[in-house]
């Protein structure tokens, strides 16, 4: 069992941390691209006072969550699951329950190496199911909307 833990700590975790940081960084960049294009590509820029006011409103409302969520969710989700969950979103309603259900089904403890791997699998499945359902909904919704008269 120590060889498995060694592989987990020396190979799996560094790999997941490296790609987790990369994908989160790319996600942040992708989230900023529309605003950058509007500002620099089309010259559409709100006044600085409006930007500062809206930023302060969002940060003051969300700041506690920036600290509380990673601290409270990470032991259950594991390091790889935390990266995946924060990138895909909807942690408390979808990712966390799927993680807990996967760990219970596999009869592993959260906070262990086994729990982290099972949690990652559960979260990955929830993301794939979520994307599948959204894709079907968008396709069906588009076909319904196209049949509605203008």
Residue ranges and their predicted role:
Residues 1-56, 125, 136, 140-150:
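Signature of multi-pass transmembrane helix bundles
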Residues 1, 9-10, 77, 81, ...:
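Short, structured coil/loop segments at alpha-helix boundaries
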Residues 55-105:
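Selected alpha-helical membrane-embedding segments in polytopic membrane proteins
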Residues 40-45, 54-56, 70-78, 112-117:
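Short hydrophobic/aromatic-rich motifs at helix boundaries and adjacent loops
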Residues 88-150:
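Helix-loop-helix junctions within the multi-pass membrane cores of secondary transporters/permeases
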Residues 17, 24, 75-78, 119:
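Generic detector of intrinsically disordered, low-complexity, polar/charged segments
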Residues 29-32, 36, 63, 67-68, ...:
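Generic alpha-helical transmembrane segments of integral inner-membrane proteins
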């Amino acid at each position: 069992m120590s060889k498995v833990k060694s592989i987990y700590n020396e190979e799996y975790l560094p790999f997941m941390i490296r790609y987790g940081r990369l994908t989160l960084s790319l996600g942040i960049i992708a989230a900023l691209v529309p605003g950058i294009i509007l500002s620099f590509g089309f010259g559409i820029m709100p006044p600085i006072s409006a930007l500062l006011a809206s930023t302060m409103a969002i940060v003051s409302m969300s700041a506690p969550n920036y600290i509380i969520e990673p601290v409270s969710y990470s032991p259950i989700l594991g390091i790889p699951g935390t990266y995946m969950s924060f990138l895909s979103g909807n942690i408390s309603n979808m990712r966390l329950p799927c993680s807990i259900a996967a760990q219970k089904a596999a009869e592993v403890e959260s906070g262990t190496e086994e729990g982290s791997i099972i949690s990652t699998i559960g979260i990955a499945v929830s993301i794939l199911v979520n994307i599948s359902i959204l894709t079907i909904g968008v396709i069906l919704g588009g076909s319904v909307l196209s049949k509605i008269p203008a």
